[in-house]
Protein backbone atom coordinates (compact mmCIF):
# COMPACT_ATOMS: atom_id res chain seq x y z
CA UNK A 1 0.00 0.00 0.00
CA UNK A 2 1.57 3.26 -1.14
CA UNK A 3 0.67 6.23 1.03
CA UNK A 4 0.71 9.84 -0.22
CA UNK A 5 3.92 11.55 0.86
CA UNK A 6 3.83 15.14 2.06
CA UNK A 7 4.50 17.78 -0.59
CA UNK A 8 7.39 19.19 1.44
CA UNK A 9 10.12 17.45 3.42
CA UNK A 10 12.75 18.73 5.80
CA UNK A 11 16.15 17.62 4.51
CA UNK A 12 19.43 18.57 6.19
CA UNK A 13 17.96 21.66 7.80
CA UNK A 14 15.92 22.97 4.85
CA UNK A 15 12.32 22.64 3.75
CA UNK A 16 12.04 21.58 0.12
CA UNK A 17 9.69 19.80 -2.28
CA UNK A 18 9.89 16.05 -1.67
CA UNK A 19 11.20 15.34 -5.17
CA UNK A 20 14.23 17.59 -4.55
CA UNK A 21 15.48 15.51 -1.60
CA UNK A 22 17.88 13.08 -3.24
CA UNK A 23 20.87 10.99 -2.19
CA UNK A 24 23.70 9.40 -4.21
CA UNK A 25 23.69 5.66 -4.96
CA UNK A 26 26.83 5.34 -2.83
CA UNK A 27 24.86 6.32 0.26
CA UNK A 28 26.11 3.97 2.96
CA UNK A 29 22.67 3.42 4.49
CA UNK A 30 21.34 1.95 1.24
CA UNK A 31 24.01 -0.75 1.28
CA UNK A 32 24.38 -1.45 5.00
CA UNK A 33 21.22 -0.32 6.80
CA UNK A 34 23.01 2.46 8.69
CA UNK A 35 19.90 4.54 9.22
CA UNK A 36 18.04 5.60 12.35
CA UNK A 37 14.33 6.34 12.38
CA UNK A 38 11.36 7.20 14.51
CA UNK A 39 7.67 6.82 13.83
CA UNK A 40 5.66 9.60 15.42
CA UNK A 41 1.90 9.95 15.37
CA UNK A 42 0.16 13.31 15.43
CA UNK A 43 -3.56 13.61 16.10
CA UNK A 44 -5.94 16.23 14.73
CA UNK A 45 -8.76 17.19 17.09
CA UNK A 46 -10.65 19.38 14.63
CA UNK A 47 -8.79 22.48 15.73
CA UNK A 48 -5.15 21.59 16.49
CA UNK A 49 -2.58 18.96 15.62
CA UNK A 50 -1.06 17.29 18.69
CA UNK A 51 2.26 15.47 18.23
CA UNK A 52 2.39 12.46 20.54
CA UNK A 53 5.31 12.43 23.02
CA UNK A 54 7.61 14.45 20.77
CA UNK A 55 10.36 14.97 23.37
CA UNK A 56 10.59 11.23 24.15
CA UNK A 57 10.69 10.36 20.45
CA UNK A 58 13.50 12.86 19.78
CA UNK A 59 15.57 11.53 22.71
CA UNK A 60 15.19 7.93 21.50
CA UNK A 61 15.99 9.10 17.96
CA UNK A 62 19.39 10.39 19.06
CA UNK A 63 20.09 7.45 21.38
CA UNK A 64 19.46 4.87 18.65
CA UNK A 65 22.24 6.36 16.52
CA UNK A 66 24.64 6.45 19.46
CA UNK A 67 24.58 2.64 19.62
CA UNK A 68 26.39 2.65 16.28
CA UNK A 69 28.36 5.93 16.51
CA UNK A 70 26.13 7.57 13.91
CA UNK A 71 26.06 11.31 14.54
CA UNK A 72 22.91 13.40 14.54
CA UNK A 73 24.26 16.83 13.65
CA UNK A 74 21.21 18.77 14.85
CA UNK A 75 20.16 19.50 18.41
CA UNK A 76 17.11 17.87 19.94
CA UNK A 77 15.41 21.25 19.85
CA UNK A 78 16.16 21.66 16.12
CA UNK A 79 14.71 18.21 15.39
CA UNK A 80 11.59 18.87 17.49
CA UNK A 81 11.09 22.22 15.77
CA UNK A 82 11.56 20.58 12.36
CA UNK A 83 8.91 17.96 13.20
CA UNK A 84 6.43 20.68 14.12
CA UNK A 85 7.59 22.81 11.20
CA UNK A 86 7.07 20.13 8.56
CA UNK A 87 3.50 19.67 9.76
CA UNK A 88 2.93 23.43 9.47
CA UNK A 89 4.69 23.67 6.10
CA UNK A 90 2.40 20.96 4.73
CA UNK A 91 -0.67 22.54 6.38
CA UNK A 92 -1.61 19.22 8.02
CA UNK A 93 -5.24 19.25 9.14
CA UNK A 94 -5.75 15.57 9.93
CA UNK A 95 -4.06 12.88 11.96
CA UNK A 96 -0.76 11.88 10.42
CA UNK A 97 2.42 9.86 10.73
CA UNK A 98 5.75 11.66 10.91
CA UNK A 99 8.96 9.86 9.92
CA UNK A 100 12.22 11.51 10.99
CA UNK A 101 15.32 9.58 10.03
CA UNK A 102 19.04 10.09 9.71
CA UNK A 103 21.56 7.98 7.92
CA UNK A 104 25.17 7.61 6.94
CA UNK A 105 25.38 9.37 3.61
CA UNK A 106 27.90 9.33 0.78
CA UNK A 107 30.50 7.23 2.56
CA UNK A 108 31.11 4.63 -0.12
CA UNK A 109 31.45 0.91 0.28
CA UNK A 110 33.17 0.84 3.65
CA UNK A 111 32.35 -1.34 6.62
CA UNK A 112 34.08 0.92 9.15
CA UNK A 113 31.72 3.74 10.12
CA UNK A 114 33.07 6.39 12.48
CA UNK A 115 31.45 9.40 14.11
CA UNK A 116 33.03 11.48 11.33
CA UNK A 117 31.02 9.72 8.62
CA UNK A 118 28.74 12.17 6.80
CA UNK A 119 25.11 11.96 7.84
CA UNK A 120 21.90 13.28 6.35
CA UNK A 121 18.64 13.96 8.17
CA UNK A 122 15.15 13.97 6.69
CA UNK A 123 11.63 14.34 8.01
CA UNK A 124 8.44 13.73 6.08
CA UNK A 125 4.83 13.09 6.90
CA UNK A 126 1.78 11.45 5.42
CA UNK A 127 -1.85 10.92 6.39
CA UNK A 128 -2.23 7.86 8.53
CA UNK A 129 -5.58 6.56 9.61
CA UNK A 130 -6.18 3.07 10.92
CA UNK A 131 -3.13 0.83 10.84
CA UNK A 132 -5.13 -2.28 9.96
CA UNK A 133 -8.16 -2.98 7.81
CA UNK A 134 -11.37 -2.79 9.85
CA UNK A 135 -12.38 -6.16 8.37
CA UNK A 136 -9.40 -7.87 10.00
CA UNK A 137 -5.93 -8.97 9.00
CA UNK A 138 -4.19 -12.15 7.98
CA UNK A 139 -1.35 -13.18 10.27
CA UNK A 140 1.06 -16.08 10.52
CA UNK A 141 3.74 -17.41 12.84
CA UNK A 142 7.09 -17.70 11.12
CA UNK A 143 9.86 -20.14 11.93
CA UNK A 144 12.58 -17.46 11.90
CA UNK A 145 14.03 -16.42 15.23
CA UNK A 146 14.78 -12.84 16.16
CA UNK A 147 18.35 -11.71 16.71
CA UNK A 148 19.47 -12.07 20.28
CA UNK A 149 19.91 -8.84 22.23
CA UNK A 150 23.48 -10.09 22.74
CA UNK A 151 24.23 -9.94 19.01
CA UNK A 152 23.07 -6.43 18.13
CA UNK A 153 21.35 -3.62 20.04
CA UNK A 154 17.83 -4.56 18.97
CA UNK A 155 16.33 -1.73 21.03
CA UNK A 156 17.85 0.78 18.58
CA UNK A 157 15.41 1.90 15.89
CA UNK A 158 17.81 1.21 13.03
CA UNK A 159 17.12 0.39 9.40
CA UNK A 160 19.36 -2.67 9.63
CA UNK A 161 17.35 -3.98 12.60
CA UNK A 162 13.90 -3.34 11.15
CA UNK A 163 13.46 -6.64 9.32
CA UNK A 164 14.14 -8.37 12.62
CA UNK A 165 11.11 -6.79 14.30
Label every PLM stretch briefly.
Residues 101-105:
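Short loop/turn motifs enriched for small/polar and acidic residues
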Residues 71-76, 88-99, 132-134:
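Short secondary-structure capping/junction motifs at helix and strand boundaries
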Residues 1-73, 81-85, 109-165:
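Helix-start/capping segments and mature chain N-termini
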